[in-house]
Curated annotation (Swiss-Prot):
Known role: One of the primary rRNA binding proteins, it binds directly near the 3'-end of the 23S rRNA, where it nucleates assembly of the 50S subunit.
Protein family membership: Belongs to the universal ribosomal protein uL3 family.
The protein's name in its UniProt record: Large ribosomal subunit protein uL3
Keyword flag rRNA-binding: yes
Pfam family of the protein (one): Ribosomal_L3
Example GO molecular function: structural constituent of ribosome
Domain of life (superkingdom): Bacteria
Alphabetical keyword list: Ribonucleoprotein, Ribosomal protein, RNA-binding, rRNA-binding
Region (Disordered) location: 127-166
Subunit structure, as described in the record: Part of the 50S ribosomal subunit. Forms a cluster with proteins L14 and L19.
Gene Ontology biological process terms from the UniProt entry: translation
Length: 209
């Protein structure tokens, strides 16, 4: 069991024993540090708050800088909570969580924010087929079509798929296999893709399935 925060470096490929190319994602995972320990008595649940990265103290608010100072750490780029059950042993504020909490062959879930695509139409956003390319039409190639009848129901139903902001949402990719762990450089290599662009922050947790 384990949990750690990290930064997506990018994708590459590794070759397995059968000389097959395996697409992989390289993640700079940790070292993370515990900034706060949540307890049932005080907070109603048990968790560790982890921090990752290092940030100029001038660029964070004073309350947040004080929060990090209480743990004896410099301000980081990201804070996130993980359940105590995911980390073996008891940790105190200021303790380090290294990358070798995971080992090769472990299955993990990776949580991140997907790439933002901006305002997108229904063909790109919802995979609509668009209108006919012939029979006299001139401007309906990528149109959504009817979104509601005139007399009945005289309205557009809630949840109707339309154009709008695409991407930039929280996403969890489950059951990715860890192909390689490199403690000396704090890198984890997982099989497959993870959410988000390069240099985006992700959370890696052991799968419970």
């Amino acid at each position: 069991m384990g949990a750690i925060l990290g930064k997506k470096i990018g994708m590459t490929r590794l070759y397995n024993d059968k000389r097959e190319a395996v697409p992989c994602t390289v993640i700079q995972a940790g070292p993370c540090y515990v900034t706060q320990v949540k307890s049932t008595e005080k907070d109603g649940y048990e968790a560790y708050q982890l921090g990752f990265g290092e940030r100029d103290e001038k660029k964070v608010s004073k309350p947040l800088a004080g929060h990090y100072k209480k743990a004896g750490k410099n301000p980081g780029y990201i804070l996130s909570e993980v359940s105590k059950s995911l980390i073996v042993g008891e940790l105190e504020a200021g303790a380090t969580v290294p990358v070798d909490v995971f080992k090769e062959g472990d299955k993990v879930n990776v949580l991140g924010v997907t790439k933002g695509k901006g305002f997108a139409g229904v063909v790109k956003r919802h995979n609509f087929g668009g209108g006919s390319r012939t029979h006299g039409q001139s401007d309906r190639l990528r149109a959504p079509g009817s979104v509601g009848g005139s007399s009945d129901p005289s309205r557009t139903f809630k949840g109707t798929r339309m154009a709008g902001r695409m991407g930039g949402k929280n996403k969890t990719v489950q059951n990715l296999v860890i192909v390689k762990v490199m403690p000396e450089s704090n890198l984890i290599v997982v099989k497959g893709a993870v959410p988000g662009p390069k240099n985006s922050y992700v959370k890696i947790v052991s799968t419970t399935k």
